[in-house]
């Protein structure tokens, strides 16, 4: 009885030690099922492709969507963020992904309620959507647009998630796909102008972009001003006669 009472605690301790060791190595060995191991991508966003040459992502992008595709280009999943955490310059989006190579396709502005573009050829099943089928289309009215477009941003990044249990840090750089153009007219003789006396339009075949952000021909779109008016800009040489201008602002997809 005394020998048994000594052996049992030793056996118990041995089993506990074995369980602890197995728990420690289960996420690091290639011989075990790794589907439950924590790994993926810790993704930061950067929008410095602008005239300020600084990261304006926290100030300019109010919602972001990341579409994930595997090494063969098949759709894996989508991650959205629409909250105020995007205002934090240190914000990172966590993507839980198994080991492998992925393409991350990101759009800023699509998940916002006031968005001006739609994703087409997009389905929820990975077997149904390939990255080459992805397109973003301007929401227009019979190829006419006279609204201030909600800003659209684009970015793409290739990333590899290793087998070890960790989140790979990466940065996805974005560019802006919308423009706000202000046209100003002024008489050389200083006489006042009325904006309603003029017709302001911009035409371009630029309503659709593919997964590489290249413009795809879908037909000419006519852009009209979303606002017009007149403004005083100073006085003439006599110091009394006001000088005014007529202006119009148009919002377009990438030119």
Predicted stretch roles:
Residues 47-59, 185-193:
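Structural motif
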Residues 64-118, 193-255:
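Tryptophan-paired
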Residues 77-176:
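Short, low-hydrophobicity acidic/polar segments
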Residues 2-15:
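Bacterial N-terminal signal peptides that target proteins for export
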Residues 142-237:
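A sequence/structural signal for flexible, mid-protein segments enriched
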Residues 44-48, 67, 107, 184-186, ...:
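Residue-level recognition of well-ordered beta-strand positions that form the cores
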Residues 35-54, 176-180, 252:
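Short coil/turn motif common to extracellular beta-sandwich-like domains
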Residues 2-3, 20-48:
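Bacterial Sec-dependent N-terminal signal peptides
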């Amino acid at each position: 009885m005394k020998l048994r009472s000594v052996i049992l605690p030793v056996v118990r301790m041995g089993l506990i030690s074995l369980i602890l060791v197995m728990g420690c190595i289960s996420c690091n060995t290639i011989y075990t099922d790794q589907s439950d191991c924590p790994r993926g991508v810790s993704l930061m966003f950067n929008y410095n492709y602008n005239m300020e040459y600084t990261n304006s992502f926290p100030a300019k992008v109010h919602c972001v969507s990341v579409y994930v595709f595997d090494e063969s280009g098949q759709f894996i999943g989508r991650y959205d963020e629409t909250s105020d955490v995007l205002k934090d310059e240190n914000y990172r989006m966590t993507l839980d992904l198994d080991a492998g190579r992925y393409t991350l396709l990101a759009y800023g502005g699509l998940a916002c309620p006031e968005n001006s573009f739609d994703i087409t050829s997009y389905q929820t099943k990975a077997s149904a959507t390939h990255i080459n089928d992805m397109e973003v289309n301007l929401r227009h009215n019979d190829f006419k647009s006279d609204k201030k477009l909600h800003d659209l941003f684009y970015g793409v990044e290739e990333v590899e998630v290793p087998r070890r249990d960790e989140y790979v840090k990466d940065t996805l750089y974005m560019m802006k796909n919308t423009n706000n153009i202000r046209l100003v007219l002024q008489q050389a003789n200083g006489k006042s102008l009325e904006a309603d006396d003029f017709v302001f339009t911009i035409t371009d075949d630029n309503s659709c972009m593919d997964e590489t952000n290249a413009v795809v021909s879908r037909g000419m779109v006519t852009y009209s001003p979303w606002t017009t008016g007149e403004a005083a800009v100073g006085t003439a040489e006599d110091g009394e006669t006001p000088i005014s201008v007529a202006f119009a602002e148009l919002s377009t997809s990438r030119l």
